[in-house]
A protein has these predicted regions:
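Short beta-strand elements
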Residues: 30, 35-45
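Short acidic/polar alpha-helix capping motifs at helix-coil junctions
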Residues: 2-4, 31-32, 53-55
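C-terminal binding/interaction regions
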Residues: 1-20, 25-27, 49, 75-130
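Short, thiol/selenol-centered motifs that function as redox-active sites or metal-ligating centers
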Residues: 33, 55-64
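Immediate flanking context of iron-sulfur cluster ligation sites
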Residues: 45-56, 93
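Alpha-helical support elements that line or immediately flank enzyme active sites
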Residues: 60-75
Length: 130
């Protein structure tokens, strides 16, 4: 059984689509069912001000991606770089055991996007300001 939150995010996905000139991009993949999530982050002062996603996969992965963008908004990059799968799963009110991969894929993509943004910030600062 799926939660009302997950169903709402599936029926009304938020923040779907690409982002022009993102500050960070990351992907997560679950090869067993070929789910792929790509997250884009826009960052100001070390916090996410906008998150968008492109997801190819099952309904729960699409819905969890939508919820993941809301979860990421306002968060510090350092916190998102260590985002636990369980926190993403909680954002959709839980997932049945056979669909928990949705949270894993989305958390992986968010962590990768946050790490990419952190890497870009370090590069922009240069070694003398690190």
């Amino acid at each position: 059984m799926y939660s009302p939150t997950l169903i709402d995010h599936f029926r009304n996905p938020r923040n779907a689509g690409m982002m022009r000139d993102p500050d960070g991009v990351g992907e997560g993949e679950y090869q067993a069912c070929m789910d792929l999530a790509r997250f884009y982050l826009r960052v100001r002062d070390g916090r996410v001000v906008e998150a968008r996603f492109q997801t190819y996969g099952c309904g729960p992965t699409i819905a969890t991606s939508s919820a993941g963008t809301e979860l990421a908004a306002g968060q510090r990059l350092e916190d998102l770089a260590a985002l636990p799968d369980a926190r993403v799963e909680a954002a959709v009110g839980g997932l049945p055991g056979e669909r928990r991969h949705a949270a894993e894929v989305v958390a992986l993509a968010i962590r990768a996007a946050a790490r990419d943004a952190l890497r870009r910030l370090e590069t922009a600062r240069g070694p003398e300001n690190a």
